[in-house]
Amino acid sequence: MRRSPPTIASQVVNRGPAASPVVPPDPPREAHATGRVTSAPPGRPAILPRPRWRLYLRLPAVHVPGELPAGAGAWASLLERSGLHLAGDPGRGRVAPAAQLPLGFVGEREILDVILGARLPLDEVRERIRAALPTPVELVDLHDVWVGAPSASSAVVAADYRVELAGVPAPVIRLAAESLLAASSLPRERHREKKTQAFDLRPLIVSLSIAAVVPPVGAAADAPMALLRVRLRHRPDAVGRPEDVVSALGEPPAPPLGGELRVLGIVRERLLLTGDAA
């Protein structure tokens, strides 16, 4: 008796055990923004992505720790008092600053990632956050972020700073800055508690410029004479700091400044994340 050929299904079974089901990739950001349910493998319940927001804040200079929220826990407590429900349990990444703002620095566009437990309209999130922020802190902008994207803290690659300087004329500072940029290396040390960290400052400097500042008539003797702008890299092994650049301006290979270079103020203009335009 003639046997019929095997069916396609039987051919697959005869090759061996069936392959594990393929988990579909996360949906694009638009799906999260509109609140559509994330696809799930067969046998698993569909999951609604947690709403994730990226806040941009203007922070004043703080000279005493604790004057304003700093760590993730302090920000989480402040936001919860606004009536916003944060996702998950305390201490599990519900709120994450991109990078800590050093004491004495002004932050013009500091980044804070927030994961909420419920999806809310953008206007409502904005108004609740603004109502919860202490008076010196300003919400500059916010937008939703695809939940699968890297956290801001893991994506910081550089930062832009603006430094007001006094005590030395801008042309003299500019010559010193040019010597730093021409150097192949700038060995430096940082001292913290009982530890000393040796690093090379030169590869951390992306760009550096000096502009003259014309003080108004009748300005104080310590009025700014120059404005330093610098972009510094953030690396896993070392982070560029503007105060390191200022101290290097007065040391070899830079020429003598002929006076005491004083810092009047430092502003972190913005943090650059992976993929940001220059």
Predicted regions located by residue number:
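Core RNA-modification/binding signature centered on pseudouridine synthases
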Residues: R2-D26, I47-R50, V64-P65, A182-A278
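Active-site-flanking beta-strand signature of metal-NTP-handling nucleotidyl enzymes
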Residues: R52-P60, Y161-A166
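N-terminal ordered "arm"
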Residues: L59-L86
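Short, charge-patterned binding micro-sites
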Residues: H85-G117, V147
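Ordered, amphipathic secondary-structure segments that act as subunit-interaction surfaces
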Residues: E108-R162
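Helix N-cap motif at beta-to-alpha junctions
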Residues: G117-L122, V168-A170, R235
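Short amphipathic alpha-helices in soluble, non-transmembrane regions
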Residues: L122-L133, I173-A183, D244-V246
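Short, low-order "capping/linker" segments at domain edges
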Residues: A149-G167, E269-A278
